[in-house]
Amino acid sequence: MGIQHKLDVFIVSENIAIKDANLLNGDSYGCTIKLKLNTKKSVRFVVLLEPEWIDEIKPMYMKLNGVSVDLKLDYKDAIKRIYSVDLVLYSDSVIHLFSDTDERYTCEYPTIKVNMIKKYYHVQHRGTTCVHIESPINVSDKYWFMKRDGWYVDRTHS
């Protein structure tokens, strides 16, 4: 079998969960999200990475229309990393989330299209993943990024 990290991306403001966006094998993870909009929009992304091992984990990076964006590492423990970012978008945009820049891996990342005008979304390119989209975001998934008293809810023993 091989190494596999689990990657979920939540577009909180649109109530969309992009699940299992990780490659089927290997320690490279990421996806491309194409957003269609016709007006200024505030968008919150939460990225949940569940590594298979804890020795060394590649950091997650984000680009918005080719420009680097700082992802905030909100939470880190042995079984998960939670990143977040709030963006203000003015027009159609492309988000790249990635751990690698090597094209051998990035060409296998999935591509998801989200039409914020028509509230429509679909997987344009699956890559070598089992990516799927859920909307609305499952209540149990929301616990991954809900805070209670300033701390993320610990679901390790749920």
UniProtKB/Swiss-Prot annotation:
GO terms for biological process: viral process. Belongs to the poxviridae C7 protein family. Plays a role for multiplication of the virus in different cell types. This is Probable host range protein 2-1.
